[in-house]
Amino acid sequence: MNGRDLVRSWWSVGVAGAARGPRAVRAAWLRRGADATGPGPRARVPGAVREVEPGPGGGVIRFARSELRVLVAVNGAVFWGWDGAGPEPSYALAGACPEPDPRAELEPDTDGGWRVVAERVTVAVSRHGALEVLTPGGVTLRRDLPPRWWEAEDGGPARWMQRSEVPADARFFGPDGPVKGPRPRDGAHRLGNGVTGTGTGTGSAAPVTMPVQLVVADAGTHLLFVDNPWDGTLTLREGAEGAGSGHDRVGTSELRMEGGPVRGWVMAGTPARVLLTWASLAGAPALPPAWAFGHHHVREGAGGEDEVRRVVAAHLERGLPLDAVHLGDGHLDGGRAFTVDQDRFPKLPVLADELRREGVRLVSVVPAAVRAEDRRGEGVFPDLPDARVQYAGQAARGFAGVWHTVDGSVPSGRVDALCLGRAAHEGLRDEVPADERPLVLSPSGWPGSQRYGGVWSGEGDVGWPGLRASLARVVGLGLCGVPFSGPDVVGGGRDGGFELYVRRLQLAAYLPLLRTGAVGPADGGPWEYGAVVLGHARVALGERRRLLPYFVTLAHLARRTGAPMVRPVWWPAPEERELRDCEDAFLLGDALLVAPVLEPGAVRREVRLPRGRWYDTATGRAYEGPAKVLVDAPLERIPVFARAGAVLPVRAEDGGTELEVWAPAPGRSGGGLVVPESGDDGDGPEAERYSVTRSGPRVVVRRETEDGAQEPSRPVRVRGLDGTGGQM
């Protein structure tokens, strides 16, 4: 306690009275302790520009206490790295760093700063290290303030923080943590895959988080990827535009990392252009086998081969399509990965062949950590080169794919999930039948995981809020380059009973991955809820089976263009602000708009339609957008709308593929793409392009080829003419 504090404390006792006096003395003593420890460590900041070293596509800007490397690649992506951080090595990149754009050069800017002008973007760096990304017209997309480092006293990794600003009207999208909609809410979001549950059930997967932001504003769309797998926290705050002559409040994000490099990538353009650039950088998504877009059922428990046969027969006898059975850890020998309990599964390859003839595949669980033999209960991560051999052995047992789980007692990083996915994909691809591709599912991941498989997000949050969160995760993952994902649909009365189960199943029927779990104590299916629920489930799964050719087409397009299969409704028109705030509906491709029921007891719901004509697929009624419409949503179905002029490949009654064409508005035209399943890696089959024109009541469908327009080789069914369907 110094003299000043002593005088202050005695003044408080003598003048302010006895009641406040002791508190003042105590506060002074605490201040004395704080003064003794001294202030906290000061952050290191870059300082002022000292020198510049131009190079291909950009160059290096050296500041007083750091340096910044800026590189514009030939694909339009912009790399930035502080403190000597380069783009490689990186788990996220599909290959080597793209070549620099020879036309982009580092040149002086105003006020002592520097800039790089490229075809699609301009990067400006201030003399103190603030990095600004602008459109070619000079409109700011984002502004990253200079980073700050806190060096560790023991010489360990330095913590760092960076604040960023975006326009007031901008909205953030991406899987940045627990969410209630496709947009992460204001507040702090942990960057790191949490672990919940035991890792053996369908509810054990934690949400996937990636340091990826897709930011949409009037000025344009851009994607930011911070290439740092360390744990951290992202704090978001959306901006607000001032009313009248009031000032705008910019949106902000603050990223705090526990260590690792300060580096990242930015790419700008339309949403489609941004995702195409991102796919060229992080790799094209793996193409799942066609059967992967069907109905998967997770079989847990200790039942053997006869129990698996019973589950398959129970579904097929009740008219419920089934394409795959996922075996949990109950089929493993002692819970050890890459093993089979020979007592309960003595003839597993025979069972797999038998089910394959019925159109059903087997998928095996693989715990992310294998049990250590010498000390029961502990786990170690597998040696990945050897794991490829182990995964190949799974194919020899008859498994068509694998799904990884996370053990709650074992720390698991996001990069580990990527490496395991790669080992599984490379181990299985040469062992599965020549006309098929392997299926690999993981509960967590890192940018680049999409190169090897998809993501299963588990049961997720319970209750009706979990329904909205499940949709948000699928949309967010798609915007981050992971198109194949979906939640698990499980039963049970604890969180809403049969109504919630039906609404979950109806939503999942329009998501890329559809997995169901056991219903009731008997580990049954939807029939456990009675005949009414069984009928609703039969309709939902039947529609999923009918749309399977459309899902296959969307998967091929995702591999070729990076476009997500499930898209936010603003995808074709990001400049429409009202669509940016629509979080209760989504686009499946560019042809269908799906409006799931997310509230209990609802039999009608309001749907916001984008611009253009849309048809209610249940009634055939046409609506003109943009508009809000109130439509029926009985328990047996959810509202689904088709875009006028759309061409959808669907499964015909004979098992072939036919074209479902929704009539354009009079005097308008439309079209669509169809990519048939070929069994290869997705690069081979040629896309079939169709055009649709309407003149009065007549709708004409043509296939566009290099030799000109031709008659379609597939059956065509036109819908939307006076609310009825007809054959062409």
Regions found by a protein language model. Name each.
Residues 15-56, 69-111:
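A low-complexity, Ser/Thr/Gly/Pro-enriched, surface-exposed linker/loop concept
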Residues 66, 73-75, 83-85, 119-121, ...:
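An acidic- and aromatic-residue-enriched active-site/binding cleft used to recognize and process polar
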Residues 137, 425-431, 435-439, 445-455, ...:
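Catalytic core of carbohydrate-active enzymes
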